[in-house]
Regions:
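Short acidic, Gly/Pro-enriched loop/turn segments at secondary-structure junctions
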Residues: 2-13
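Short beta-strand-to-coil "C-cap" segments at the C-terminal boundary of structured domains/repeats
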Residues: 6, 43-48, 196-199
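Surface-exposed amphipathic alpha-helical segments
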Residues: 1-3, 168-199
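Signature of long, low-cysteine stretches enriched in small and polar/charged residues
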Residues: 14-16, 21-23, 29-164
Length: 199
């Protein structure tokens, strides 16, 4: 479980760096192959949007989005526009995303103006699912999942993430379930059912 703990801490460090507060839950289960564990992170979307969107506070699109978050409802036309825009950003083939890259520093010598980090960190996104509405939920809910490979130098950690955006009026929440890729088949139905039954 050392590997899982380490990769979970790295995922949470990203949220910490962004200044986003979150709740975290540990899920445990067992089957014939042994003990299983996963993390479930819950982010208050309204609070995060206000924190990250300070510059856009007067932007009409930002105001409209915040109003939708308050109402807990997105009309069908806006939903199609949003899903279209979001899904265009989701890689359709295996994609490597650099998490840290060259650092630009001021220098008279252009050869020395870039410093490469000692350890390159990347996240490979594979089999990413399009964001889609979830039927049979109390609140409007959208979900997506993906297999991920987190690489930190020579260490690679295969992960699985399953996310749901639940539009609870006044308190919309983004839930992200994270587990190791080998536990994906065990946790996928658990995550899916949990996201459907949020009250």
């Amino acid at each position: 479980h050392q590997m899982t703990r380490q990769s979970n801490q790295q995922a949470l460090a990203i949220l910490d760096q962004m200044g986003i507060s979150y709740d975290i839950y540990q899920l445990q289960g067992e089957d014939k192959s042994g003990q299983k564990d996963a993390l479930l992170v819950a982010v208050d979307v309204k609070e995060a949007a206000q924190h990250l969107g300070k510059k856009e506070a007067n932007d009409p699109m930002f105001i409209a989005a915040m109003t939708a978050l308050d109402k807990g409802q997105i009309d069908p036309v806006t939903e199609q526009l949003l899903l279209g825009t979001i899904n265009k950003q989701i890689p359709t083939s295996t994609t490597v995303v650099p998490l840290n890259g060259p650092i630009n520093v001021s220098s008279r010598d252009p050869q020395k103006a870039t410093i490469m980090p000692k350890t390159l960190r990347t996240l490979t996104v594979e089999n990413a699912e399009q964001v889609h509405p979830v039927a049979g939920t109390k609140y409007q809910t959208y979900a997506a999942s993906s297999r991920l490979l987190y690489a930190d130098g020579n260490v690679q950690t295969p992960l699985y993430a399953n996310a749901a955006f639940v539009l609870k009026p006044g308190k919309p929440v983004l839930y992200v379930g994270i587990t190791t890729d080998v536990q994906r088949d065990y946790f996928k139905p658990i995550f899916d059912n949990a996201f459907k039954s949020i009250k």
